[in-house]
A protein has these predicted regions:
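Anion-binding alpha/beta catalytic cores of soluble intermediary-metabolism enzymes, centered on
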Residues: 1-267, 272-336
Length: 336
């Protein structure tokens, strides 16, 4: 069974409630129909009922009736949620009038439904910007305990089966935090290992903190940051298998790892790679994807207390369908 099939199977094993606040968008509705047909999640759609039903009819979607459909303009819990939102944002000066308007916004409404235990995760981005997706999540759901930094993890599936877990690697940050400091980088490492377990199904994440230096082979403040981040990650998660700083070849190739970092538990065996900054991460994964013909799945947002994921506006129905399954796996993990 390939990785995506494994993720779908895990989602089916313990169905989660996933909010799709862009229900009037064609690809989103088609993905919802497929998810409902395959029984991988309980779907909550937010949108104008007449528009959603007309689109479903136009596209011949047979399963949308199984979803919970919420009209943001006429939701019977809107006032209750507005009062709770005003309380959450009271320190920022939000009034009840402002809160009432915000809960008509499907992205805010979805996050409030999650906050009040009515759902387990949310996916948007087919129409919305990353900022619009993240803003309500950070204002309402907030970060996991002990985490202040949101990041974007990615599943990389390579044809080179000798690397990672049978060719599967989990890498970060590729999407969110441009120049993490040592503390933020340590959080990214811990969250990426967590995602590797929850989504990729790794029994034992082995985290390499990447740099252009291996174990002091070069001296620079950016290497020092990676070394400090490794130390902080070990403090935050004492059972986590992690090492750094390591060059990419030392992290992935056993013979190189043995020469450059003798005695390391991670060198040559890494299945999770943490980049020193977003620039390196984003460029690096896209080069592997294009030049190495690898499959890239994600980014998957990490560090939020309940999963909220962001799609590319160029996403396909398949992308959304698999993100529903990924978000469900994250939601299961968040409840542990």
């Amino acid at each position: 069974m390939d990785l995506l099939s494994q993720i779908v199977a895990r989602a089916k094993s313990d169905k989660q409630r996933i909010v799709l606040p862009e229900a009037e968008e064609e690809r989103t509705l088609c993905a919802a129909d497929r998810a409902l047909a395959d029984d991988i999640a309980d779907i909550i759609l937010i949108g104008n009922p007449a528009k959603v039903e007309a689109l479903a009819k136009e596209k011949g979607l047979q399963n949308i009736g199984k979803a919970t459909l919420i009209d943001p303009e006429n939701y019977d819990k809107s006032e209750e949620l507005a009062e709770k939102l005003a309380e959450i944002r009271k320190s920022k000066g939000m009034t009840i009038e402002q809160a009432r308007e915000l809960v008509k916004n499907p992205l805010y409404l979805g996050c409030m439904i999650i906050k009040t235990e009515g759902a387990d995760g949310q996916i948007s981005g087919a129409l919305s910007t990353t900022g619009d997706t993240l803003r309500p999540a950070l204002q309402i759901i907030k970060c996991q305990p002990g985490i202040t930094c949101v990041s974007g993890g990615l599943l990389l599936i390579s044809k080179q089966k000798q690397y990672g877990e049978d060719g599967v690697l989990v890498v970060a940050d590729v999407a969110v935090t441009p120049m993490p400091d040592a503390n933020q980088l340590s959080q990214i490492a811990v969250c990426t290992a967590q995602m590797a377990k929850a989504v990729a199904g790794f029994k034992e994440p082995r985290v390499a903190m990447l740099s252009f230096s291996t174990k002091g082979s070069a001296k620079h403040e950016v290497c020092d940051k990676v070394i400090e981040a490794t130390r902080l990650a070990k403090e935050m998660a004492p059972d986590l298998k992690i090492d750094g700083e390591l060059q990419a070849d030392a992290a992935l190739v056993p013979s190189v790892g043995a020469k450059k970092a003798p005695g390391s538990d991670i060198a040559g065996k890494a299945n999770v790679l943490v980049f020193p900054n977003l620039e390196v991460g984003n460029i690096g994964y896209k080069m592997v994807q294009r030049l190495g013909d690898a499959i890239a799945i994600g980014p998957v947002l990490q560090g939020i207390a309940r999963p909220v994921n962001d799609l590319s506006r160029g996403c396909s129905v398949d992308d959304i369908y698999y993100m529903i399954a990924i978000t469900a796996c994250q939601a299961m993990d968040a409840k542990k």
